[in-house]
């Protein structure tokens, strides 16, 4: 299949691994809202049919884009978590065929996801649902609500957010406010 279409299209993956696409919206309003936000920060999202099983149902990251199979997507909030992986990735690695985040990137993408939820004024359970985070979603929600943020030190190192002391010294809003959404 030839690669067609624009950012945000729908398509299917052919034998060559290329994606044929046409521009469409998502049927689920929450999915559409999350995708619109992710695109607004500069991350490409494509609606497609994923032929293979993926780590998160209905989602994959390829070549710097999030692929969403809405028929197989079980938790729309996972879109924000996957976007977090791309957002905090080293820009030189972001467009790799397959992204390989390390442990620090996982924590940082969790922090990025929470900041996105707060920015969108959404319930944290949308991302931190009971089927994710190895049973630790409730603890993440509780810790974030108490101001105990994981992953924020790396967001600060990347210049994406500031912890309270640095924010006060710099005259900027502290995390969960983001100074920028992409590393």
What does each of the following model-derived ranges do?
Residues 30, 76, 105:
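Hydrophobic (often cysteine-bearing) scaffold residues that line and stabilize catalytic clefts
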Residues 2-6, 11-13, 18, 150, ...:
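Sequence termini and other peripheral, non-core segments
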Residues 77-90:
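Active-site recognition of the HExxH zinc-binding catalytic motif
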Residues 64-78:
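Short pre-active-site segment immediately N-terminal to the catalytic Zn-binding motif
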Residues 55, 88-116, 126, 133:
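Post-HEXXH active-site segment of zinc metalloproteases
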Residues 140-183:
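Pan-zinc metallopeptidase signature
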Residues 125-142:
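Domain-level detector for trafficking modules
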Residues 2-5, 11-62, 72-73, 119:
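Auxiliary, metal-adjacent structural segments of Zn-dependent hydrolase domains
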